[in-house]
């Protein structure tokens, strides 16, 4: 039986005899077959000799071996098709995988390869040829420990088919190790001068959702960090392959995927090719590139030496001899941690972008501004630039409706600045205006939906008043949450302006002059604005009877057990917000009646001093509330007079 099973061949017995037969069936070769067999052995021996005699050559021994073996194996393929009388399909591709694809193979590494054909009918035609080639490689391995065709690994007799066939084998789990096989295919390198089918197969793997995490940059980095860890303390020996080469391999795979490094000849798949592209594109600091390159070359030199010494794959070496390389690999793993962190930061930034874009699509202006501000703050905190995030958004779109809002916001930038200028820096983060405008410009740069022009939706009108209300609602949302009094001052001021604009809209009196009047209005000092002379964010003065929510369960949770003047200030601020909703005398009376029926009003009416309680005097906070009501009533009357005058 052959490695993959007995095969039937139409070999010209006089010319090649048993060259392609299973050596267990026919251990002896005919003279003609023996001559051809020795020819292949001599080519391998000469290649080994060239490598040893060319020390100091610019090309490394492992690169020299991979280049030379590719030529020998290519010749073996052509010879086998000729000998078996099979016409080679013109589109057939053979790909090296594993160490051969990555230019890491030594004289004693396995021969990992697979075959891709264009049509299903070609599979039956070419499979017997690669069965025969496997028999030949097995015979060579028996003689010299070289080019072993692993029967359960990436084997050209087992892994053969169209791109759809091979992809189906992966998806259906019909290979020994799906993840390892997928990675081997993704890092494979063509033996013959054709690669289009390989690209098609790689694209299928990358685009398959169930494989996306398996072949992502983050996955590769984590394998370097978590799967191929440093040897245990006290270990006497280490594996050059497992403890040094594998972490570097997966780091380079992660870098190739993250930066989308590619070259048509497949050179990017080797460590030297990846390192060259990293350096050419200036993608990492030179110190980090040089470290990877240095450790890789040291490890490969040692691996080549060990394999030659033992005349087989042998990767173990004393821990003490490997210590310096292991220390450098630890630093390379640290780079992996940095890259994973950066990827996760970009993933989170992308989610924040999606949230902001969703708000645009809904026409929620204040929601968009808040989400865009969160994105800006996150990117600033994580030291991310717009150009870092832009590639992550290549498949994202902004609708014409969203674009219309962005344009209107951009046009209202100066008005936005005036609205924010009425507040102190304690309520609005410095640079907030420029930050959000900057993010709006960034959003406007993103492409629109397919086939849509970069113009706003002409049927979606965004009035200036709507934009300004959205801006002021946003300013309310970003008021400093750690300072309740300042937050309420901001809320009250913005509510006042929002209510004023809404009244202008109801009276059909929106124009640049009236909007400017609203924008330019400023709030009085906090104590005057809240009409409560003891306004404070602390519990306030010492009292015989401190106001609390103890007997008012309905409001206890809302005010988080605040006490004293701070509690009354908080309640007054909320009442101020509610009064701002009144549009006429009737609605004002209804709101006042509603507020007086609440537990909060009873807290305002409860005296904190002994005299106030004994004599049942009106508290200063109730007086403040009454003053608020009168101010609101006067504001309504003033607005009504202005409306009549304009009409």
From Swiss-Prot:
Alphabetized GO MF terms: AMPylase activity; ATP binding; guanyl-nucleotide exchange factor activity; phosphatidylinositol-4-phosphate binding; protein guanylyltransferase activity; small GTPase binding
Disulfide pairings: none
Major location (coarse): secreted
Alphabetized CDD domains for the sequence: SidM_DrrA_GEF
Gene3D superfamilies the UniProt entry points to: 1.10.357.170, 1.20.120.1520, 1.20.1280.280, 1.20.1440.370
One protein family per Pfam: DrrA_P4M
Domain of life per record: Bacteria
Location(s) in or outside the cell: Secreted; Host cytoplasmic vesicle membrane
Bilayer topology annotation: Peripheral membrane protein
Keyword set, alphabetical order: ATP-binding, Guanine-nucleotide releasing factor, Host cytoplasmic vesicle, Host membrane, Lipid-binding, Membrane, Multifunctional enzyme, Nucleotide-binding, Nucleotidyltransferase, Secreted, Transferase, Virulence
Catalytic class of the enzyme: transferase
Enzymatic reactions: L-tyrosyl-[protein] + ATP = O-(5'-adenylyl)-L-tyrosyl-[protein] + diphosphate; L-threonyl-[protein] + ATP = 3-O-(5'-adenylyl)-L-threonyl-[protein] + diphosphate; L-tyrosyl-[protein] + GTP = O-(5'-guanylyl)-L-tyrosyl-[protein] + diphosphate
Region (Protein adenylyltransferase/guanylyltransferase): 1-339
Sequence similarity: Belongs to the DrrA family.
Record comment regarding domains: The P4M (PtdIns(4)P-binding) region mediates binding to PtdIns(4)P and membrane attachment.
Primary role: Virulence effector that plays a key role in hijacking the host vesicular trafficking by recruiting the small guanosine triphosphatase (GTPase) Rab1 to the cytosolic face of the Legionella-containing vacuole (LCVs). Acts as a GDP-GTP exchange factor (GEF) for the small GTPase Rab1 (RAB1A, RAB1B or RAB1C), thereby converting Rab1 to an active GTP-bound state, leading to the incorporation of Rab1 into LCVs. Also shows RabGDI displacement factor (GDF) activity; however, this probably represents a passive activity following the GEF activity.
Name this protein carries in UniProt: Multifunctional virulence effector protein DrrA
Organism field: Legionella pneumophila
